[in-house]
Regions:
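Bacterial Sec-dependent N-terminal signal peptides
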Residues: 1-32, 310-311
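A short beta-strand motif characteristic of beta-propeller blades
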Residues: 29-37, 69-75, 111-117, 153-162, ...
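Start-of-domain marker
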Residues: 29-90
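Repeated scaffold domains used in trafficking and secretory/extracellular systems
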Residues: 38-45, 79-86, 121-129, 165-173, ...
Length: 311
């Protein structure tokens, strides 16, 4: 029985080793990207064509690259701008609370249109472009959420909003629901600002929407919001500096290198984590077997000594 158990444990360890090797190799794809370009990056965005957008807080620059690191466009700002999740690479949206301005730029990061909110509104804390016609504005002074058509410069709707503006870092409005993100809290409201959901989230940065799915991009974690189950962690790497995803892949900057993970890679990583869990359980089983073997040996030794004494 003992030999059978040892053989079984050995075969299990071999199979786990093969899982480790396969998953480790398949789940790591380093993109050929200049590490100097990644070193001082504060945030990273990706589109569904595999292009990368790097925002540097040091000089307020926003640069677009293809997946091989070739520069496709660059913007230099004099004040901080917040980049809205990139749904359409032909029209990228940026908002500056300092400048009270929203900008739309094309695939080469050339200006398409600028919206100046200073003339028409008191103070806009945050803005979210729903499409190429209307935006949602959080007016801090009026404590209202405004639906504004910038094509004909008219306010379509105005909703009271008396929640705190101080720690707000991102806003998203979709299908009559308002998604509010602070650095450590996620909230969902209806347009009457009745709270529908609330959950803590660490080091949150921004929202991303993929069709009907609302995602939260945090420092090194990505969550998916499920109205029935709450927040579900779909990507996590404690060692990552920055993470992001498009519809097909996950991206991360780690050790000033750029990594790409396909959906298949994520499945392999889950297998790897499960294998690690099984490895720990096996190690405990081996330790238990060795302990039992040692105890059995001690008992046999005592019995031999008793026999030697003539009992």
């Amino acid at each position: 029985l003992e030999r059978y158990l040892c053989k079984k444990v050995f075969l299990k360890l071999i199979s786990l080793f093969l899982v480790f090797v396969f998953c480790s190799v398949s789940a790591q794809k380093v993109l050929p990207f200049d590490t100097l370009k990644l070193k001082e990056t504060k945030d990273m965005f990706t589109d569904d064509y595999g292009n990368l957008y790097l925002y540097r807080n040091k000089d307020f620059s926003f640069t677009k690259y293809d997946s091989l690191g070739k520069q496709l466009g660059k913007l230099m700002f004099t004040v901080p701008f917040k980049v809205q999740e990139i749904q359409n690479p032909l029209s990228v949206t940026l908002f500056s609370e300092n400048a009270q301005e929203m900008r739309f730029v094309d695939q080469n990061l050339n200006d398409i249109q600028r919206l100046d909110f200073k003339q028409k509104f008191s103070f806009i804390k945050h803005a979210y472009a729903e499409d190429l016609q209307q935006v949602w504005l959080l007016d801090e002074s009026m404590k209202r959420l405004l639906q504004y058509n910038f094509r004909n410069e008219t306010t379509i709707n105005s909703f009271p909003f008396d929640a705190s503006f101080d720690d707000l870092i991102d806003l998203l409005v979709f299908e009559n629901k308002v998604y509010i993100l602070s650095k450590d809290q996620f909230r969902v409201y209806n347009l009457k600002f009745e709270k529908l959901f609330e959950a803590p989230v660490e080091n949150a940065k921004r929202f991303r929407r993929e069709n009907e799915v609302i995602l939260i991009i945090a420092k090194n974690t990505i969550f998916k919001y499920n109205p029935e189950k709450g927040l579900i962690k779909i990507f996590d790497d404690p060692d990552a500096q920055i993470v992001d995803k498009n519809s097909l892949s996950y991206f991360e900057i780690k050790g000033n290198k750029l990594y790409l993970y396909t959906l298949e890679d994520i499945a392999d990583i889950k297998k790897l984590k499960e294998a690690e869990k099984q490895k720990i359980e096996l190690q405990r089983s081996i330790e238990k077997l060795e302990k039992e073997k040692s105890e059995k040996s001690d008992i046999l030794k005592v019995m031999d000594e008793i026999q030697d004494l003539g009992f």
